[in-house]
Amino acid sequence: MSDTLSTPPRRLPTERPRPLDPPEVLGRLRAEEPVSPLLYPDGHVGWLVTSHAAARKVLSDQRFSARGDIKKVPFEVPSGSRPWEKVPPGFFMHMDPPDHTRYRRLLTGQFTVRRMKALEPRIEEITEQHLDEMERQGPPADLVPAFALPIPSLAICELLGVPYGERRRFQDHSTTVMRIGSSGEEVAAAFAAIYGLIHELVQLKHKEPEDDLLSGLIATGELDDAELTGIGMLLLMAGHETTASMLSLGTYALLRHPEEVKRLREDPTLFGNAVEELMRYLTIAQFGVPRTALEDVELEGKLIKAGDGVTVSLAAANRDPGRFGDADSFDVGRSTSGHMAFSYGIHQCLGQQMARVEMRIAYSALFRRFPDLRLAVDPDEVPLRAEATMYAASRLPVAW
């Protein structure tokens, strides 16, 4: 075990030689030094984890904390942003046990198979409505505002029980948060507006409960309004941004692999597996998952000291050839068992089954409705969100 740095610390690699592949440096580190020194923007020297095996170890070991008030992130945060002195109520993904355990238990009781099944027809209806509008307006279309952004937003509104008359406001503010070019002030104002809308929604559900997630949480009697609002805020933003990013980037990836689209058209039952492969291959959480060591831990021969920041590169782990054969190829028929696009361990994505349903329905409906779907610009002209925490296409012009 070594507590000295075998190589000089470097900043998190972000430069992509090819738009659908992670930075090449990550692959070299995974092969040569899967736990390597990482220089954080504030000057702290922590660690970057790039192999599948080491990533699983970190994410399943509670000696590595997910607490948002002590985390170190490997990217520059917007000017004016302040680190949390305390994690806000309900923001459970930024908490450790026992707080995380309590919230997770309550939410697991709401993400039931019955509720997910009940949502499927509505997600199908929402998807078809947006495809109808695309067809009515005719090509070309920008798939991001026409398809990728609204479908997940409306699906989350269904889950939370947002009244129909309020959904446009939720959509508009969520779009502001995700839109490239929004100023820091605009994003902050949109976050505040969403928080206010969810607080109002919680008050409504107290008075008029329905068969939705927020009403179900209220019925437990175990959460106060601040916690309920925080949970709603977290679910809305996390569930919208991740799935919307996958719908835009996933469609872009499929259109760049016409032979795989041909396989899907010949055998539509492959769409479920294609969703898994897209998540593995693209891994949109491009800056990784932050953790903080709570005590000294040995990992892959390196001594991680208490207080050290650890960044787990899910993108590198999901391209590990030691876990996935021919890992850099895109194959909708491959076995994707073990991918970590939804993270791993006790903090893995709670809404992953809903996200899978949304993507399977959306991709299959899109390519069924528009069998000649193609990019309307050169592939290299599609602008990508290289600076965003969730990698995605900011515009996706298509024709059919």
Regions found by a protein language model. Name each.
Residues 1-400:
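Cytochrome P450
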